[in-house]
Amino acid sequence: YLGKPIAPARMKEPLHNNDFRRWVQAMHYANLLHYDHDYAAEGRWGRLVAPQSFAVAVDDGHGAGPACVGCIPDSHLIFGGDEWWFYGPRIYGGDELVNEKVPFDYVVKETSFAGPTCFQSGDNNYYNQNGDFIARQRSTSIRYARENAVEMGAMEATEDPVWTEQELKDLEDKKYEFIKMMHELGHGKRYWDDIEVGDELPVRVIGPHSVASFATEWRAYLFTIWGGTHRPGLDMAAMGFTEEFAGHENDPVMERDNPEWTDGAYFGPSRGHLFPEWARKIGMPRGYGYGASMGAWVLDYLAGWAGEWGMVVHSKASYRGP
């Protein structure tokens, strides 16, 4: 498998500005460049532009495909991290992207979470219709024996925390501080000579997280839309997912027969994110967040601080807590 390309990801229609708007709304990234037509027209690119984090939204599995190859019997998968390289070209409405997917490597380690655990990584190479290389995402998945995770109980089942009205108000005030920072920078430039190692960066607060917020994130990934993707077809059972989790997620044949089974929200390996009882069947304490969204938060945080005249060139993040 390693180093050999697998079926690429391709959307069926060109991207639309509303795809970008839906994405930043789901990721709580209130940058006017990506949703306000008039503001964007006055900026560097003269039109609405996708955030750098958007590339993962055009994949058919938020980057996990090349990091989940080969069979590990009776296993499950969670995201472990993403490393990104960006090469300059931006994504606009009307673009058509393709993701070239190549498995990269793997290592098996002993973990307190699930005993022997496979950390597998794969590259997602995003190109536009002109062949411009936009970005590379090296995604790492954590593949483990489901029964081990449940038996070892590293993450005990818990209920959602309860927030007071004052706590929620304080969070909203803190969230607005980052938004206000972006407004104040506007179309301005953050010059290299004006920053130093050790400068204190602004705080960005995201949350509180809930099943509602996770569902909003999930629906911003274009591959979750019925019929929107050229699906290569994956045999989840052949990769080792347990029978109750394998399902028909991203199954192109089932999508034409009964798409309710295929979009990943209600059935299949991804449903543990939204349904606590299924989360606990794979060793999670309750409904939990999407790794690819965590990666987007990192990229959006850095890009929002840098402003439209800056860009993220390289980022490497590990997802330590779902």
Regions found by a protein language model. Give the residues of each.
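A generic structural micro-feature
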Residues: 76, 114-118
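A short beta-strand signature
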Residues: 118-129
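A structural microfeature
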Residues: 135-137, 202
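Hot-dog-fold acyl-thioester-processing enzymes
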Residues: 1-81, 148-309
